[in-house]
Amino acid sequence: MNLDRRKFFDYSVKAIALAYLSMINLFPKANISGDEKKLPWSSNTFKFPLENFKLQSGEILKNAFLLVDVNGELNQSKSNAIIFATCFAGSHKFNQMAYGINRALNPLKYCIITPNLFCSGYSSSPSNTSPLQDGPRFPSVTY
């Protein structure tokens, strides 16, 4: 994705605004009182290793990983899984505003799997990759 300076600035401002909104808890996770540890459903966040991942460009992203957030549990037939990918400037934390008992995605009914996109800062990104591929050396990623 080629970005001129104006588009880069626009995307950066949007990303900062979304990060700020997630920090001030404008969108609470659920209609329950207390801290997040008292959610009435299971919740787990983990790094999913992809090893040396081949991108569409043919470049290899070394030691790639996705940060994955899972809320709810798979049923026995595994038919209740929902993949809820993050947006370009978002994260699993931003997506959590849709989770809850009286919300669009009920983790007591569905298993909501949220992989963070590459370059999100949570999954493999220019800021958390080895010096051989960090910063401006990070491979070009398409979506």
Language-model segments: residues:
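A short loop-to-beta-strand scaffold at the N-terminal edge of the catalytic core in hydrolase folds
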Residues: 61-72
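N-terminal export signals
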Residues: 7-29
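Secretory targeting signals
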Residues: 1-7
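Primarily extracytoplasmic ectodomains and periplasmic/lumenal surface modules that are beta-strand-rich
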Residues: 73-77
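Short beta-strand element of the alpha/beta-hydrolase
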Residues: 79-87
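C-terminal segment of N-terminal export signals and the immediately downstream linker at the start
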Residues: 23-45
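Generic short beta-strand segments
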Residues: 46-53
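Gly/Pro-rich cap/lid or specificity-loop segments adjacent to the active site
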Residues: 89-143
